[in-house]
Regions:
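A generic alpha-helix surface/boundary motif
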Residues: 7, 25, 40-41, 154-155
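Glycine/small-residue-rich loop that forms an oxyanion/phosphate-binding "nest" at active or ligand-binding sites
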Residues: 14, 32-76
Length: 183
């Protein structure tokens, strides 16, 4: 919803010819949609825009506002079959907000989505959430918006890529996978 692409995604899913159960759909709740009661309504609207019966993974986009109330509604959506798994985005595992979710959740987050790439490795974060069984998924896996493509032009990465007959992007994505991150 935050990226205003749900209608297009829903149409693509319907038209692509691939069975729905073979497509993984992820979405995020915007902070203005947080709050017990309010979030369930937002999920229903999201599903309507997507023209789908369920979302595979739904994130709390940011740890602000009534994210605990949102989480309670997200759990209800899981129980109703509208959502399959829950995730948190932009939370820091050492912050109070992370522990607030963990202390209040009946259904624990399956995924923590954070910015990470070779310039922002976040390995400590991965280790902090590992005991909870939470997978770390990286946004900006090829480098942040402010990097202007620097990671893809990094001399060390280019040297490794050339030595292995791969592109810089392939080397970076391989690094993510070898480090145990989802991309």
């Amino acid at each position: 919803h935050a990226y205003m692409n749900e209608r297009g995604v829903g149409e693509a899913v319907k038209e692509c010819g691939v069975p729905r159960e073979e497509i993984w759909i992820t979405s995020k709740l915007w902070p203005t949609e947080y709050g017990e009661g309010k979030t369930l309504e937002a999920i229903d609207k999201m599903l309507s825009r997507l023209q789908l019966d369920y979302i595979d993974l739904l994130y709390v986009h940011q740890p602000v506002g009534d994210f605990v109330g949102a989480w309670k509604d997200m759990e209800k959506a899981v129980e109703a079959g509208k959502v399959r798994a829950l995730g948190i985005s932009n939370f820091d595992a050492s912050d109070e907000v992370f522990h607030t979710i963990m202390d209040n959740a009946r259904i624990k987050p399956a995924v923590l989505q954070i910015e990470c790439h070779p310039y922002a490795q976040r390995l400590e974060m991965r280790e902090k959430v590992k005991p909870y069984g939470i997978l770390v998924e990286c946004w900006f896996p090829l480098g942040g918006a402010m990097s202007n493509g620097a990671l893809l032009k990094d001399p060390t990465i280019l040297e490794i890529a050339e030595a292995h007959g791969k592109s810089a992007a392939q080397i970076i994505l391989r690094w993510h996978i070898q480090e145990g991150f989802s991309v």
